[in-house]
Structures are given as C-alpha cells and as structure tokens.
Amino acid sequence: MRLAIAKLHAQLADKRLDFLHKLSTKLARVYQLIVLENLNVSGLLKNWRLARAIAQQGWSIFKGLVDFKCQKYLRGFREISRWEPTSQVCSICGYRWGKLDLSVRKVRCINCGVNHDRDVNAARNIEQIGCSRPAPQQARDLPYPRSP
C-alpha cells in the first residue's frame, strides 16, 4: 500500500514538473519579456486554508525554470517586489483604493468607474510596473568584448 501511494505521488510530481517545463518553454519562446511578482510563498503557506494548494503548485520551481529559459532564448525576465500594491491600484487610472479582503473578486474603481476582476487588474499592474522599469544589468545583457 505504501509503495502504491509513493508511486502515485511520484507520478503526480513528474506530471507537475512536465507541465511546468512545457509552460515555461512556451512562455519564453512566445514573449520577449516575462514579469513575475516575487511572492512570499513561505508566508502564504502559513494560511492553513491555502497551504496545500499553494505547496502543490511549485511556484519557486516555475520561477527558476522561467528565468533559465529566458536566458536560454535571450528573453527579458524581471521580478517585481511583493510589496508593490498590484491588487490595490486601478490599472486604468492609477487610483489606489487600498487593501481588499481576499474574498473580494470584483472591484469598481470609484475614480474612473471601470469594473475590474481582481486578478486581471493585478496582472495588468505587474505588466505595467515590469515594463516601465529598466532591467538590472546582467551578464547576458552586456555586449561581447571586442578583440583588438
């Protein structure tokens, strides 16, 4: 019985890793720049209601794979701080409405009147922040030295 359960867990882990490899490869091939939010996964795991779902997603593995494949395919990769108020700001007008309870999924901006899905609005804000800031210089971004 233990071996059967261990085998099932190994199969799930293999399927998850295969999915993460395929997704990260597709993203790195299609997009010139990928921007991710640097989430505090260990802090999120302290919420017992979300812990199992978060732990099973393999976010840190996904981030590492995306970073590696962006280097491989010469794409841009940026992380923005977890302290950016991505779900607290209207992606259209920039109005900041403040912290929202996690149960609130839809928001109407009182400044411009646009209805937002919380996750879509946060994704747009992450994109805007990532595209507006210059990328840190990395070895792959530097020109090759010229020989005399």
Locate predicted features.
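Positively charged, low-complexity nucleic-acid-binding target-recognition regions
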Residues: 53, 57-148
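Substrate-contacting helices/loops that form the catalytic groove of nucleic-acid
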Residues: 1-63, 133-148
